[in-house]
Protein backbone atom coordinates (compact mmCIF):
# COMPACT_ATOMS: atom_id res chain seq x y z
CA UNK A 1 0.00 0.00 0.00
CA UNK A 2 1.17 3.51 -0.71
CA UNK A 3 0.12 6.83 0.70
CA UNK A 4 1.75 8.85 -2.05
CA UNK A 5 -0.47 10.72 -4.53
CA UNK A 6 0.32 8.09 -7.15
CA UNK A 7 3.10 5.76 -8.14
CA UNK A 8 3.32 6.99 -11.72
CA UNK A 9 3.90 10.69 -12.25
CA UNK A 10 2.93 12.31 -15.52
CA UNK A 11 5.19 15.30 -15.43
CA UNK A 12 8.06 14.42 -17.71
CA UNK A 13 8.16 14.16 -21.47
CA UNK A 14 10.30 11.26 -22.60
CA UNK A 15 13.12 11.89 -25.03
CA UNK A 16 12.37 9.22 -27.60
CA UNK A 17 13.25 9.55 -31.27
CA UNK A 18 11.81 8.08 -34.44
CA UNK A 19 13.63 8.24 -37.77
CA UNK A 20 16.26 10.48 -36.13
CA UNK A 21 13.94 13.40 -35.51
CA UNK A 22 12.64 14.73 -32.17
CA UNK A 23 9.11 13.82 -31.25
CA UNK A 24 6.65 16.67 -31.38
CA UNK A 25 4.63 17.33 -28.25
CA UNK A 26 1.63 15.18 -29.19
CA UNK A 27 3.87 12.25 -30.06
CA UNK A 28 5.79 12.66 -26.81
CA UNK A 29 2.58 12.55 -24.76
CA UNK A 30 1.35 9.52 -26.67
CA UNK A 31 4.69 7.77 -26.14
CA UNK A 32 4.48 8.47 -22.42
CA UNK A 33 0.95 7.07 -22.33
CA UNK A 34 2.09 3.91 -24.11
CA UNK A 35 4.83 3.43 -21.51
CA UNK A 36 2.34 3.81 -18.68
CA UNK A 37 -0.04 1.33 -20.31
CA UNK A 38 2.80 -1.16 -20.62
CA UNK A 39 3.64 -0.67 -16.94
CA UNK A 40 0.03 -1.15 -15.87
CA UNK A 41 -0.21 -4.36 -17.87
CA UNK A 42 3.14 -5.89 -16.95
CA UNK A 43 4.24 -4.50 -13.58
CA UNK A 44 2.89 -7.37 -11.52
CA UNK A 45 2.06 -6.37 -7.95
CA UNK A 46 2.94 -2.75 -8.73
CA UNK A 47 0.08 -2.39 -11.20
CA UNK A 48 -3.26 -1.06 -9.96
CA UNK A 49 -5.13 -2.91 -12.71
CA UNK A 50 -6.88 -5.93 -11.15
CA UNK A 51 -5.11 -9.18 -11.97
CA UNK A 52 -8.23 -10.65 -13.55
CA UNK A 53 -8.46 -7.73 -15.97
CA UNK A 54 -4.77 -7.43 -16.89
CA UNK A 55 -4.70 -9.96 -19.72
CA UNK A 56 -7.45 -8.13 -21.59
CA UNK A 57 -6.07 -4.68 -20.72
CA UNK A 58 -5.13 -2.78 -23.88
CA UNK A 59 -4.54 0.66 -22.41
CA UNK A 60 -6.28 3.53 -20.68
CA UNK A 61 -8.57 5.86 -22.64
CA UNK A 62 -7.62 9.52 -23.01
CA UNK A 63 -8.96 12.74 -24.40
CA UNK A 64 -7.07 13.89 -27.52
CA UNK A 65 -3.98 15.97 -26.80
CA UNK A 66 -4.95 19.66 -26.77
CA UNK A 67 -2.15 22.22 -26.70
CA UNK A 68 -4.66 24.89 -25.64
CA UNK A 69 -4.84 23.09 -22.28
CA UNK A 70 -1.11 23.31 -21.63
CA UNK A 71 -0.05 26.44 -19.76
CA UNK A 72 3.68 27.13 -19.78
CA UNK A 73 5.52 29.54 -17.48
CA UNK A 74 2.93 29.33 -14.71
CA UNK A 75 3.91 31.26 -11.60
CA UNK A 76 3.03 29.91 -8.16
CA UNK A 77 1.15 32.83 -6.62
CA UNK A 78 0.64 33.22 -2.85
CA UNK A 79 -2.39 31.50 -1.38
CA UNK A 80 -4.82 34.16 -0.16
CA UNK A 81 -7.93 32.06 0.45
CA UNK A 82 -9.73 31.67 3.72
CA UNK A 83 -8.62 28.13 4.48
CA UNK A 84 -5.59 27.43 6.71
CA UNK A 85 -2.27 26.96 4.94
CA UNK A 86 -1.50 23.82 6.94
CA UNK A 87 -4.25 21.22 7.06
CA UNK A 88 -5.04 17.51 6.96
CA UNK A 89 -6.13 16.17 3.59
CA UNK A 90 -8.43 13.12 3.74
CA UNK A 91 -7.39 9.99 1.87
CA UNK A 92 -9.36 7.26 0.16
CA UNK A 93 -8.75 4.81 3.02
CA UNK A 94 -10.08 7.12 5.72
CA UNK A 95 -6.82 8.57 6.97
CA UNK A 96 -5.65 12.18 7.20
CA UNK A 97 -2.39 13.28 5.63
CA UNK A 98 -0.56 16.49 6.64
CA UNK A 99 -0.53 18.90 3.71
CA UNK A 100 0.25 22.52 2.95
CA UNK A 101 -1.41 24.99 0.60
CA UNK A 102 1.70 26.10 -1.27
CA UNK A 103 -0.02 28.66 -3.46
CA UNK A 104 -2.28 29.00 -6.48
CA UNK A 105 -1.76 28.57 -10.19
CA UNK A 106 -3.81 30.80 -12.48
CA UNK A 107 -4.69 30.12 -16.10
CA UNK A 108 -7.23 31.29 -18.66
CA UNK A 109 -9.77 29.15 -20.49
CA UNK A 110 -12.46 30.63 -22.68
CA UNK A 111 -11.41 34.14 -21.78
CA UNK A 112 -11.94 33.59 -18.05
CA UNK A 113 -9.32 33.38 -15.33
CA UNK A 114 -9.34 30.13 -13.38
CA UNK A 115 -7.23 29.11 -10.42
CA UNK A 116 -6.24 25.86 -8.76
CA UNK A 117 -4.63 25.50 -5.36
CA UNK A 118 -1.33 23.61 -5.35
CA UNK A 119 -0.33 21.48 -2.38
CA UNK A 120 2.79 20.00 -0.87
CA UNK A 121 3.07 17.16 1.63
CA UNK A 122 5.16 16.73 4.73
CA UNK A 123 8.34 14.95 3.77
CA UNK A 124 8.33 16.27 0.20
CA UNK A 125 11.00 18.42 -1.39
CA UNK A 126 8.91 21.58 -1.04
CA UNK A 127 9.11 22.42 -4.75
CA UNK A 128 7.15 19.61 -6.39
CA UNK A 129 3.46 20.44 -6.39
CA UNK A 130 0.41 18.22 -6.15
CA UNK A 131 -2.61 19.64 -7.99
CA UNK A 132 -5.76 17.51 -7.79
CA UNK A 133 -8.86 18.88 -9.47
CA UNK A 134 -12.50 18.24 -10.25
CA UNK A 135 -14.25 19.53 -13.35
CA UNK A 136 -17.51 19.18 -15.23
CA UNK A 137 -16.45 15.79 -16.61
CA UNK A 138 -15.97 14.36 -13.10
CA UNK A 139 -18.47 11.61 -12.40
CA UNK A 140 -19.17 10.90 -16.07
CA UNK A 141 -16.24 10.77 -18.48
CA UNK A 142 -13.71 11.01 -15.66
CA UNK A 143 -13.54 9.80 -12.08
CA UNK A 144 -16.00 11.36 -9.67
CA UNK A 145 -13.34 12.10 -7.05
CA UNK A 146 -11.12 13.96 -9.49
CA UNK A 147 -7.84 13.68 -11.32
CA UNK A 148 -4.26 14.61 -10.45
CA UNK A 149 -1.41 16.68 -11.81
CA UNK A 150 2.16 16.46 -10.48
CA UNK A 151 4.28 19.52 -11.21
CA UNK A 152 8.03 20.00 -10.93
CA UNK A 153 9.58 23.45 -11.29
CA UNK A 154 11.44 24.48 -14.42
CA UNK A 155 14.94 25.93 -14.12
CA UNK A 156 13.47 29.42 -13.68
CA UNK A 157 11.18 28.29 -10.86
CA UNK A 158 8.03 28.41 -12.97
CA UNK A 159 5.73 25.48 -13.68
CA UNK A 160 3.99 23.93 -16.66
CA UNK A 161 0.33 23.28 -15.91
CA UNK A 162 -0.54 20.67 -18.51
CA UNK A 163 -3.98 19.10 -18.34
CA UNK A 164 -2.98 16.61 -21.04
CA UNK A 165 -1.02 14.90 -18.27
CA UNK A 166 -3.98 14.70 -15.88
CA UNK A 167 -4.35 11.20 -14.49
CA UNK A 168 -6.58 9.15 -12.26
CA UNK A 169 -5.27 8.06 -8.85
CA UNK A 170 -4.38 4.40 -8.56
CA UNK A 171 -7.11 3.86 -5.96
CA UNK A 172 -9.59 4.25 -8.82
CA UNK A 173 -8.65 0.71 -9.80
CA UNK A 174 -7.39 -0.89 -6.59
CA UNK A 175 -8.30 -0.04 -2.99
CA UNK A 176 -4.81 -1.14 -1.86
CA UNK A 177 -3.64 2.32 -2.88
CA UNK A 178 -4.22 5.26 -0.55
CA UNK A 179 -4.95 8.45 -2.46
CA UNK A 180 -5.61 12.03 -1.29
CA UNK A 181 -9.14 13.23 -2.00
CA UNK A 182 -9.55 16.40 -4.03
CA UNK A 183 -10.43 19.41 -1.85
CA UNK A 184 -13.65 21.16 -2.85
CA UNK A 185 -11.75 24.40 -3.53
CA UNK A 186 -10.25 22.75 -6.61
CA UNK A 187 -13.55 22.16 -8.37
CA UNK A 188 -13.61 23.82 -11.80
CA UNK A 189 -17.07 24.66 -13.21
CA UNK A 190 -15.96 23.83 -16.75
CA UNK A 191 -15.08 20.74 -18.74
CA UNK A 192 -11.39 19.86 -18.92
CA UNK A 193 -11.31 17.61 -21.96
CA UNK A 194 -7.71 16.51 -21.60
CA UNK A 195 -5.85 13.72 -19.87
CA UNK A 196 -7.16 10.36 -18.72
CA UNK A 197 -10.76 9.25 -19.10
CA UNK A 198 -12.61 6.42 -17.42
CA UNK A 199 -12.35 3.01 -19.02
CA UNK A 200 -15.69 1.33 -19.76
CA UNK A 201 -14.06 -2.09 -19.29
CA UNK A 202 -12.32 -1.60 -15.93
CA UNK A 203 -14.32 -1.61 -12.72
CA UNK A 204 -13.58 1.45 -10.61
CA UNK A 205 -13.85 2.03 -6.89
CA UNK A 206 -16.31 4.56 -5.47
CA UNK A 207 -15.16 7.68 -3.63
CA UNK A 208 -16.86 10.93 -2.73
CA UNK A 209 -15.75 14.04 -4.61
CA UNK A 210 -14.77 17.30 -2.99
CA UNK A 211 -13.20 16.47 0.35
Where are the language model's segments positioned?
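Mid-length scaffold segments of soluble, non-membrane domains
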Residues: 90-144
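Extended, aromatic/histidine-rich regions of cofactor-dependent oxidoreductases associated
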Residues: 3, 26, 158-159, 167-211
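Histidine-centered metal-binding segments
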Residues: 3-20
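Acidic, glycine-rich flexible loop segments
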Residues: 135-167
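Terminal leader/tail segments of proteins
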Residues: 67, 84-87, 126-127, 154, ...
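Short helix/loop capping segments that flank catalytic or ligand/cofactor-binding pockets
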Residues: 80, 116, 140-142, 169-172, ...
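Extracellular/lumen-exposed scaffold segments
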Residues: 51-57, 84-92, 96-101, 158, ...
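Conserved "landmark" site that anchors the functional core of diverse proteins
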Residues: 22-93, 203-205
Amino acid sequence: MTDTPDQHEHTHEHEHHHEHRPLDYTEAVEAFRAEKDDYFKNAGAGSPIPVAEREAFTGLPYFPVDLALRFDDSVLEPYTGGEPSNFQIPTSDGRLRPAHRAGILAFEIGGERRVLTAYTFDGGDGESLFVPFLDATSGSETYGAGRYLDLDPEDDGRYTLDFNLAYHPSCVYDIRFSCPLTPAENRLPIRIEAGERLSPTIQVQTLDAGA
